[in-house]
Amino acid sequence: MKITVSVIKADVGGIGGHTKPSDGLIKAIRDTVENSGDLLIDHYIGYCGDDTHIVMSHTHGVDNEKIHKLAWDAFMAGTEVAKKEGLYGAGQDLLKDSFSGNVKGMGPGVAELEFEERPNEAFTVFAADKTEPGAFNYPIYRMFVDTLSNTALIVNKSLASGVVMNIMDVEKAQIASLRLWEDKPTIEAALMYPGRYVVDSVYTKEGEPILDASTDRLHNIAGTYVGKDDPIMLVRTQKNFPATEEVGSMFNNPHFVAGNTRGSHNMPLMPVKLNSAASINFCIPIVESLVFSMHNGKLVGPFDGFSTPDWDYIREIATKKAIAIRSQGFIHPATLVPSELEYAEGYRARMDVLETKMKPMEDDKSNSDRKENYEDPD
């Protein structure tokens, strides 16, 4: 049976700031989805920080207009409640005035896979808040490239043969299909820069879908800062794919990601329990793990993948790393480079003042001898 799993998320309002959606907002979204008739086989609704996600199973394929419109209508209903309740950032991820056939490029994040359902279909959804799509680069690399992190890359015949990894240039809206293991150095070079190059999807070499992730950057759509992109990722697990615990353990080393308060800092990505609010301790970037089984499109779960006691220790590591880097204040790399600052207009205003105070240096070197571009040390 061919099934599509669609995961669509958006930030349409938070209590007192970028914290969590209200009960009324969640109810409005749930009511809209539940009143969709027989469009869906099953669904689940939850949140990560102030982002609400809708997990849907159906038979309509990816990029289906009816499915995307349902999600759009649900988020619009949530937005109306957010406005009535005075929630912060009401509708902030809905960047267009009306639905135009597909929510991609309109603000909400989307991860979708269509596949022939296995007898024991298993998949995990990773929902993140206060960060950008490139936050998943490091965990995905560990899943499919790093044998020190994932023994399956040695002992599992399918994974050992390599996968096809589609990497997107989010600045130019271009995509490259790269193969392991022949393109390993190229993949690594791209993933060095998660602000520009992000993993869009992963397939087996036989064309079986394994992973899909949201890749839209909100400031690329809106032209100005409206919030961090808060990505979502869908990963099929078990058998010829990474095991559930192999996928989950890729988040056990809280790596530094762009995001945090005002979307302008580097901070560790903290694994948290399902339906966790965003921290008001500088909005540490967070990620949740929703583990599902599925049969004939009916969902069982989610199991809270980051709820067991061992993850409390990982959260402690993330907290200590967060405190350490925030103690550096505004000095890079605690903050992002100017081109990645989400409040760039304010920074430019400060630099304009600085520029008016700059005077030529009086020495023997001409201006033409001076290095003007300090990004390239060579």
Q: What residue ranges belong to the model's regions?
A:
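Regulatory and interdomain segments flanking nucleotide-handling catalytic cores
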Residues: M1-D378
